[in-house]
Amino acid sequence: MSIKSDRWIRRAAEAGMIEPFEPGQVRTAGGNRIVSYGTSSYGYDVRCADEFKIFTNINSTIVDPKQFDEKSFVDFKGDVCIIPPNSFALARTVEYFRIPRSVLTICLGKSTYARCGIIVNVTPLEPEWEGHVTLEFSNTTPLPAKIYAGEGCAQMLFLESDEVCETSYRDRGGKYQGQRGVTLPRT
């Protein structure tokens, strides 16, 4: 497997792999500095959309991935999401992805957030998976933390295999195939 360059990412985006797509790095908006997004040397920095689900313990439920209670979250829509101390929020990417059959995509958090104690977690985007990426933000600090919608939040790295997989995510009918919006756990 080899990591793919900015040139490859641009060609794949022309074929519909990332929509909407930014061919370069965007670092300012309206004359203000922002957390960068767009194509980098060997990756693509995604943006966070303005839809969030913030963890709450108002209902004092137990978190169970097999029987997840939607009441564990408070829905929020806005330009800035404030995650409570030592808490968690879900969001989604602005970008919609269509991963080629020979590609596995790994997501890493951006250092701007990591250096503030905000960790972004996303599982790999498997071959032939498509959808909005659900982003998991953990605020590891004892203070409230801000996440900015419309700005960069994580980087996607594209790894292409020299051999196409036997069974893709689409072939096996993956439960998150075609997801739109912030998607909660499914079993």
Swiss-Prot record:
Function: Catalyzes the deamination of dCTP to dUTP.
HAMAP family in alphabetical order: dCTP_deaminase
Gene3D superfamilies documented for this protein: 2.70.40.10
Active site: E136 (proton donor/acceptor)
InterPro entries in the record: dCTP_deaminase (IPR011962), dUTPase-like_sf (IPR036157), dUTPase_trimeric (IPR033704)
Quaternary assembly: Homotrimer.
Gene Ontology biological process terms from the UniProt entry: dUMP biosynthetic process; dUTP biosynthetic process; nucleobase-containing small molecule interconversion
EC number: 3.5.4.13
Family: Belongs to the dCTP deaminase family.
CDD domains: trimeric_dUTPase (cd07557)
One GO MF term attached to the UniProt entry: dCTP deaminase activity
Protein name, entry field: dCTP deaminase
Keyword vocabulary terms for this entry: Hydrolase, Nucleotide metabolism, Nucleotide-binding
Catalytically driven reaction(s): dCTP + H2O + H(+) = dUTP + NH4(+)
Species per Swiss-Prot/TrEMBL record: Bordetella parapertussis (strain 12822 / ATCC BAA-587 / NCTC 13253)
Pathway: Pyrimidine metabolism; dUMP biosynthesis; dUMP from dCTP (dUTP route): step 1/2
Family matches, as NCBIfam families: dCTP_deam (TIGR02274)
UniProt-annotated binding residues for dCTP: K110, S111, T112, Y113, A114, R115, T134, L135, E136, Q155, Y169, Q179
Top enzyme class: hydrolase
